[in-house]
Amino acid sequence: MMNNYPFSSNSPKSFNAYPRSDFDIESGTIRRARKFRNSSFHPIRMVKSLANRIHYYYKLHPVLVFLLSLSFGVTILIILSVYENHYKMLSNYRKPDIGFNDNPYAKLQNLVMVAGHSVYTSSNCGKVDGEDSWLLMPYQKHPGQAATFLAHIQKGIDIAAKDDEALLLFSGGETRKEAGPRSEAQSYWSVAESEGWFGKEETVRWRALTEEHARDSFENLLFSVCRFRELTGTYPHNITVVSYDFKKERFAHLHRSAIGFPESRFSFVGTPPSLNSREAALKGEALVRAQFQEDPYGCISKLLRKKLGRNPFRRTIPYPEGCLEIEPLFRYCGTAPYRGSLPWAQ
């Protein structure tokens, strides 16, 4: 019967036929086994090695290494800044949780903006189509001028009545000292109220509101977009602007491009000026349009001085509160279009 010998390593009788040491045949001695370096990852050593290399190259080419380091640092800062702004915009771009479940404006998706051009100064609304009921500038004093204001109001109401998802905003601030602290926007709303909303009170009145801080046509558009966000919790999907027909190029191209709103979702509806004022209006519009071409945001030229003069009661502009996602657009001042992130461009 064969005996089973335990050859396990734990047995005191185990036999190591192949020792781990190296046997030298010539000398007849056993040499210690060669120890191999540990190949594990050493980040500290790598960092030190990289630092030594950089130091070595810096001694050889100090200017080149400095410029490369500076370029790398600036690139990192730019990337961090872009991601920070993008994160802020995304984190802010959400509907407020409090009160918006019962907000009737939250379901509105489209903006209809009527740009104001004058302040109603009459103590009653019996003669809304009379020139003496409005504060008119010298270039506005023409027969039929007041009727053009009513045409804008009615056109805005008609457009909103055909779109159940539209918010109608009358836009214009307290621009004239002689008119007292009354805004163009409130004037238009009051006239619409006196006219019974031209037969569409039931469907339009509850979603017709005001933006009462704009001092020029660019602010009419930008401030109304912010006001829309303030009321609905989101930004308009479509925008329709109502003004004089000769201002189409200014609104549909210059102002729309300045805020980066998609052309396919922007509409302009124009009404004609009074017959006697058209020639002068076209000349004046050409001048203003040229100024906005040079200064798209109205912040560095005669447009700025004109705008400051249209705030006689020292009103503080509340925006961009209510639309913090586009705060950088409000702060931007340049001749080139704004290139930052915008909610409607996502």
Mark where each language-model region is:
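Initiator methionine at the very start of the polypeptide chain
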Residues: 1-2, 46
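A structural signal for short, hydrophobic/glycine-enriched beta-strand patches
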Residues: 2-35, 55, 82-293, 297-298, ...
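Low-complexity, Gly/Ser/Thr/Pro-rich intrinsically disordered linker/tail segments
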Residues: 288-346
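N-terminal signal-anchor transmembrane helix specifying type II single-pass membrane topology
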Residues: 25-87
